[in-house]
């Protein structure tokens, strides 16, 4: 499996109150083969940035959605925080998540990037402006604080 596939499976499972079990076959000396180690290390790098959307979270009332562009989105929550993980390596300057309404006083941030993001409610859809030159990731997490 590639890191992208592991991340997408993990996010999908957690958004549905599940977990992910990976079978990694070590060598006789306990070391892990390079072709298995590399995707695990890349997944770990992604989790360093986006782990708060995974660890100690639970499912939300809506498990999945998509953007107007057709990108898949998965949701998790922790307390007053809602996490929307966009399962795509590319983000446009504006991301519109269909059928997602948030309270008017909410703040939206992108994990791994500094500062709040501009957003507006367009009917039942949430439109979020994405900053330029963001760090490349396999998936991006919007943190919505209500």
Ranges and model annotations:
Residues 1-146:
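Mature catalytic domains of secreted/periplasmic carbohydrate-active enzymes
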